[in-house]
Amino acid sequence: MAENTSIIIKGARVNNLKNIDVEIPRNKLVVITGLSGSGKSSLAFDTLYAEGQRRYVESLSSYARQFLGRMSKPECDFIKGIPPAIAIEQKVSSRNPRSTVGTSTEIYEYLRLLYARVGKTFSPVSGQEVKKHSAEDIVKCMLEYPEGTRYTVLAPIVLREDRTLQQQLEIDMKQGFTRLEVNGEMMRIDEYKPKEGDTVFLLIDRMTASSEKDSVSRLTDSAETAMYEGDGACLLRFYQSGGSPCLYRFSTKFEADGIIFEEPNDQMFSFNSPIGACPVCEGFGKVIGIDEHLVIPDRSLSVYDGAVVCWRGEKMGEWRDMVIHGAEKAGFPIFTPYYELTDEQRRMLWEGTPYFEGINAFFKMVQENQYKIQYRVMLARYRGKTLCPKCHGTRLKPEANYVRVGGRNISELVDLPITELKLFFDNLQLDPHDADIARRILTEINSRIQFLLDVGLGYLTLNRLSNSLSGGESQRINLATSLGSSLVGSLYILDEPSIGLHSRDTDKLIHVLRQLQQLGNTVVVVEHDEEIIRAADYIIDIGPRAGRLGGKVVYQGDMKDLQKDSDSYTVRYLLGEETIPLPEHRRPWNNYIEIKGARENNLKGVEARFPLNVMTVVTGVSGSGKSTLVRDIFYRALKRELDECNERPGEFTSIGGDLQNLRNVEFVDQNPIGKSSRSNPVTYIKAYDEIRKLWADQPLAKQMGYSAGYFSFNSEGGRCEECKGEGTITVEMQFMADLVLECESCHGKRFKADTLEVKFHDMNIYDVLEMTVNQAIEFFTQHGQKKIVKKLQPLQDVGLGYIKLGQASSTLSGGENQRVKLAFYLSQEKADPTMFIFDEPTTGLHFHDIKKLLEAFDALIRRGHSIVIIEHNLDVVKCADHVIDLGPEGGDKGGNIVATGTPEEVAKCAASYTGQFLQEKLHPSLP
């Protein structure tokens, strides 16, 4: 490859990279793959992105640089041909409670512009459109009447400068006006005696309808006079033979029904601006108030059965009794579960009726009595974030929702799923003038909506909070935003964009990546998904194994150059030389935990059985309700049953089944095992306790009086006090990246010299922490330390033999963190029967890692545990004993159980997308 058509990296040595040379073709779709821990992210993010970003920042002025982060140069000999780099990672990009899907994709900004430019304001009183009128509108109204129809031009009497009506009329007479219309009758001004309650207008002119030029000119003059005298208002009263007079009101002000409305502008629709934000919640949509979920935690109960928890007990129960006694007259159903009540029935319960007082009245009484301690405690117990009573969660002041486009206000649009929003804009009809104004705005909106659909996010709504998105969703929104920004000549680096994406949507994602590349960008993707690897223009495989045994380029080239018998695990799996085998049989099951009536978010009252002592996989397209069912309902409800935890589960009717067969439930996520640099795998799995005891048992340690605690780098004693057991000292630099220097006292060894003199077979405590898990197992096996080997073995079993015992947990990937936790549970041999729940455990895992992960799952099940996994990866799904497939689509069109049973049974279900893709995995064709 020529230098100007490729990015050339020479001698990359970041983390475990072994002085590698890589050439990456520019303006292509490039996939970097390899085992977990092989060095993919070190190449993509710590080398490529770090250097691309650093060079871009260095090209800016020193003034601009002071506002940007300090960037250090990655460890490599040189990098050539690198464009400005943009990283799109699996991180929830915004913790800002105001940030939504709409604002982060810029669709909401364009919606604001659309409503400001072509929105029509409608009066909440009459529903008529609010307009500003001109003399031309008045002439147009007159021309609609037959020739010769009599009419009058009137103006309301405006009292200026604190005058009385009599004083104003005298001034009008001096200006040449002679008549008034009083309560519909004509009268001379000098004959009128003002009375309270009279409707009085100043007569400007009396005319007959005519299309003649002189008549139109006269009306125009009279209308302008009326608007001047009437402070912008003018009235026409037409007198038709045989009918009552018709009155038309015109105004140069933006008003209707006696209300002056605000003219639409883009700030009016911004909840981040004081001009548009709801004055009560200040644009958050929620306020601290009485939380419905705390007052009615179990929505499957009726009012009669005690749904309202604050009305339990003898004294407060009087309020419940009041509702029961008045319910028949009020037409309120006291035996209906709360979740089945209509909006009107819920309003009756909260706001009360003439026959009983509601929950709001109860809490008003509590507030009035909060000088008593028991009432203060009660009020605090039921307070929480609740929907704003003024804007009802729209975040905008009411005036913003008087404006409509295509019959809908902006709050209704942001509540629609993206799929329905697309239909709305596809069918939007505007008049030619408005269509011309809105053409460019609609183009931007439609293209961004299409990008969101292309990355499989059609189930989201624009008002969904950014901080409630999963890492995969957040990354794909950033990807859609990048496409919308249409940058050219950049380097995009993505970290597993297929996370959380069903196989059905992978083709769309590949199409989006291609679009980004075809704009003229280089797209580098760290990925394990087989379809995306096969779709790439160029593949770089880092390996052959992980950690110290990785960091080399084992393959670079395109799909057609793949060779058999390669050192690359990726190549072997792609060519079918290695596979993840199907289990020989599916485990049978009789015991289960059952959830009934799950209806949180988009779940449609589903019933699901989670078998015990087998591996259950919950599948479905993005947004179908998997996480809601498993994490929000099943996990929290089960935890509440077993541990009496306070975390509120989502809405469901009941949990039952063989609960007596379980003792614990564990949710194993990918969060770091410890946030400090001191936390490491060997301490997490409790193996370091045994290692410290072994060193404390050595003759020199006993002679010096060193206890096991002396060999800890977390407490004073044997650790180096200069660096507090860190091994490094961080020097903060003002305008440069912080310097991390090796501690001069211990030379990076974390312990005092006398501590390091204690040795076990020529190895001191620092030497052991520097060993990989594989090396440590070999060392301790040779010297008969079975206890320590037994503790370390699970780390090797889950495929983490390459990590150092003392490696800081902050340097582990999400997948590695999850497997360290899994190793900890595998090490608990005598643990009580536990339900383990995993959320996409294959994130960041190569085919070869998945094989080891499945072996670890089998080991847990053999020990009497049960496993439930939320997963899209078909290699895991095909190995399940039981599959629960949710769908059929995401969002409102999901939330149902489409199929359950063994993978073979699900594959036969025509309505299941998962089933369609499973057929190929269960009956693979030759590669």
What do the predicted segments below correspond to?
Residues M1-P927:
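Conserved phosphate-binding elements of NTP-dependent enzyme cores
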